[in-house]
């Protein structure tokens, strides 16, 4: 008897069915006892990333166990923003807001309009009156809904503290519930991805950012000069009485000038915005007052800053930092010019998302390029795995021959044909680190370390292809001599290959059966010629 009661209790409770990632819930009305067998949304292109002003086509499929009457099927396009706020994991609050909701009826639209008549006081349909119905079995309702466009549209995104989600929601409602006071009888959802294009070609060109460093003695000298200028009116009144004293002080000041200890750091970026997947060229120039060398003196990092708003007005905003990629280069101040110029590269990874600032009350994402300059040889730069960056030259000899071979091959390719590396970013990406990077926050705390931060915009499109260096450095940035094939052969040949004209070089035919790598054929050919030249000439008198 108790088992029968338990069975009746379970049959009365509302049920939830999860099928193909879609959840359908059914209430205790005319569709109770699980009368809907399956309810789902099929999209014609389920894996496509949609853009605003594009139309999504598909069909809503519902499988019913028995005949039902007086129902309507509504399809809605919804954009929902979710964010988790709170410092501790146990006290996280969720904020949910729908920024977009566009609805249309797939079935029963005419009866819904009749029930919502303005003259009718009670929008109620009698249960005995049959307006429409669906028979037992599977029913398919095709649809075509357009994604709106405008300034309020957002790109789909999911991260640890929040998300922007687009989904299609299809509900099966009773005509008695057209006022929305009760929950829908059945519901299913289907998510899809939307990306809002962000054009970076129309952004203004950024100005060169400069940082000037001066010694403490020079700063104190400037303060003294400013105080002297403020008291110039008083000194003019007493100029006649203190002529001798002022002249002697001026002579002393001229004889002991302070040394000019000024360091100027200039950073220039060709554009203010870059696309996802592009390489960012950064020009760095340093004017120093003395020769200087640091093996890990220049650290450039692409940083993403995420700001998450609080649940209330009084709650503080949380800030999270994420280092995307990093490049480390040495600094060498030329003793003659006392200058250093270099171009470093960073890359926007393909899995990055564009800059987002329109959802400021929830969260925002901004990108910055941080350039840190280490002006001290005593500072040791460590990575996250405690690996030292900038080891001496003597310690680098034991790293293996593979890195040296790769560098030689790249140099040879650039000399033979510079275009081979122009479209291949492997040569530039080899100096970009995506893991085991230097902690920039710790680097800032060291002495004689300075830098700057430049905001950049990460977008998705570039309508105007500009001539400046944007994604990949141009051919002019690669300093390679334009050698003709004959000059290149002369350069590759040994010095004594064509000196002796007495001994003729015999002809030979290469063996096609032997598989030799293409890059080593010329080298093997030269060795063979040298061996043949070193053999003694044949003697006919023997």
From Swiss-Prot:
Pfam families assigned: Arrestin_C (PF02752), Arrestin_N (PF00339)
Bias type Polar residues, positions: 460-487
Matching SMART domains: Arrestin_C
Protein encoded by which gene: RIM8
GO molecular function per UniProt: protein-macromolecule adaptor activity; ubiquitin protein ligase binding
Name this polypeptide is given: pH-response regulator protein palF/RIM8
Crosslink feature (Glycyl lysine isopeptide (Lys-Gly) (interchain with G-Cter in ubiquitin)) location: 521
Other observations noted: Present with 784 molecules/cell in log phase SD medium.
Residue spans of biased composition, Basic and acidic residues class: 518-530
């Amino acid at each position: 008897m108790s088992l029968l009661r338990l069975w009746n209790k379970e049959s009365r409770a509302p049920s939830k069915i999860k099928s193909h990632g879609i959840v359908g819930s059914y209430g205790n009305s005319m569709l109770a006892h699980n009368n809907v067998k399956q309810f789902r949304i099929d999209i014609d292109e389920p894996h496509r990333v949609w853009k605003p002003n594009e139309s999504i086509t598909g069909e809503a499929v519902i499988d019913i166990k028995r005949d039902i009457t007086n129902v309507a099927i509504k399809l809605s396009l919804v954009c929902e923003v979710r964010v988790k706020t709170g410092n501790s994991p146990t006290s996280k609050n969720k904020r949910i807001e729908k920024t977009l909701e566009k609805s249309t009826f797939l079935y029963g639209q005419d009866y819904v309009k009749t029930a919502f008549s303005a003259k009718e006081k009670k929008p109620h349909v009698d249960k005995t009156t049959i307006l429409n119905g669906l028979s037992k079995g599977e029913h398919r309702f095709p649809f075509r809904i357009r994604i709106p466009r405008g300034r309020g549209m957002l790109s789909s995104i999911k991260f640890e503290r929040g998300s922007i989600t687009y989904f299609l929601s299809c509900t099966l409602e009773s005509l008695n519930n057209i006022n929305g006071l009760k929950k829908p009888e059945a519901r299913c959802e289907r998510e899809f991805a939307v990306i809002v294009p962000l054009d970076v070609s129309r952004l203004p060109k950024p100005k060169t950012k400069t940082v000037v460093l001066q010694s403490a003695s020079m700063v104190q000298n400037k303060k003294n000069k400013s105080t002297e200028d403020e008291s110039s009116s008083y000194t003019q009144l007493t100029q006649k009485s203190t002529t001798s004293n002022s002249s002697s002080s001026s002579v002393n000041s001229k004889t002991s000038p302070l040394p000019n200890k000024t360091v100027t750091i200039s950073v220039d970026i060709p554009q203010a915005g870059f696309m996802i997947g592009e390489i960012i060229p950064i020009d760095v120039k340093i004017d120093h007052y003395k020769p200087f060398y640091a093996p890990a003196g220049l650290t450039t990092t692409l940083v993403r800053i995420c700001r998450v708003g609080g649940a209330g007005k009084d709650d503080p905003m949380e800030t999270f930092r994420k280092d995307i990629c990093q490049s480390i280069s040495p600094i060498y101040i030329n003793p003659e010019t006392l200058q250093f110029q270099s171009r470093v590269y960073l890359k926007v990874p393909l899995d990055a998302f564009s800059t987002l600032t329109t959802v400021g009350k929830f969260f925002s994402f901004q990108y910055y390029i941080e350039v840190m300059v280490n002006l001290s040889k005593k500072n040791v730069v460590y990575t996250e795995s405690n690996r030292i960056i900038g080891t001496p030259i003597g310690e680098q000899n034991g790293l293996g021959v593979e890195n040296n071979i790769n560098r030689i091959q790249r140099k040879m390719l650039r000399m033979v044909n510079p275009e081979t590396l122009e479209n291949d970013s492997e040569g530039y990406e080899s100096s970009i680190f995506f893991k085991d990077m230097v902690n920039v926050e710790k680097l800032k705390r060291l002495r004689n370390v300075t830098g700057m931060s430049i905001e950049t915009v990460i977008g998705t499109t570039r309508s105007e292809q500009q001539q400046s260096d944007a994604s990949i450095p141009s051919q002019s940035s690669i300093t390679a001599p334009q050698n003709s094939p004959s000059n290149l052969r002369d350069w590759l040949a040994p010095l004594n290959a064509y000196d002796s004209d007495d001994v003729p070089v015999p002809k030979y035919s290469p063996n096609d059966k032997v598989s030799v790598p293409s890059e080593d054929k010329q080298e093997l050919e030269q060795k063979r010629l040298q061996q043949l030249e070193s053999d003694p000439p044949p003697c006919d008198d023997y």
